Amino acid sequence: ELDQISANCKALGAEVEALNVRPSTEAICDEIIAAGVKRFGRVDILVVASGKNDVSKIDQMAPERFLDVMDANVTQSWLMAKAATKQMLAQGQGGKIILMSSARGLLGHPAGYTAYCASKSAVDGITKALGCELGPTGITVNAIAPTVFRSPLTAWMFADDEKATTTRAGFLARVPKGRLGEPEDLAGPLLFLASRASDFYTGHILYADGGYTSG
């Protein structure tokens, strides 16, 4: 999958430095940023788009599973933000940090989402706190909070079988736009937050959710 993403980017004329690593320690995150600096000379934009979900009722979830979700969604976002911040501060020209939250950071869910909801609420907290902390430096920190988007993890919701149809209908009843999200729907918010157009925005959570959280 990483090779395919790299190939797609190169086909669009972009230079690519692909690293197949998990940002699980401070040292690894520093190495990721250093690789970007080595290849491109500097780092101006960080997008932390990885994440994990583990759905289970609280009485059936082992603490290790809860902590694993928190590590993937919270700790690794924090570590990457820290590594990028150090580089951006050294460069002295500001920068853009974009984290990936979720509508579940704002809203609960009855189907066993305690780990995921808690982790995305924490991402929102990191975003707001860093927005305040780094505001004077010219580094903006914002997050995008999607709802259900087409991805390998949600592909089943886009199917035509009875389970998907029933689940989708119940969910879409709360989405004013009347459809699920497509990857293209994230392009605009990402471009905005990565560009000079968002220079006066920091500490914000941008809900790319078709109006789901408005009701």
Language-model regions, residue ranges each:
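Short C-terminal tail/terminal secondary-structure segment
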Residues: L107, L190-L191, R196, T202-G215
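Active-site loop-to-helix junction immediately N-terminal to the catalytic Tyr of the SDR YXXXK motif
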Residues: M61, G108-C117, A129, M157
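Alpha-helical segment proximal to the catalytic Tyr-Lys
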Residues: K86, C132-P136, D199
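Substrate-binding pocket helix/loop in short-chain dehydrogenase/reductase
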Residues: C29, K57-I58, A62-M70, F171
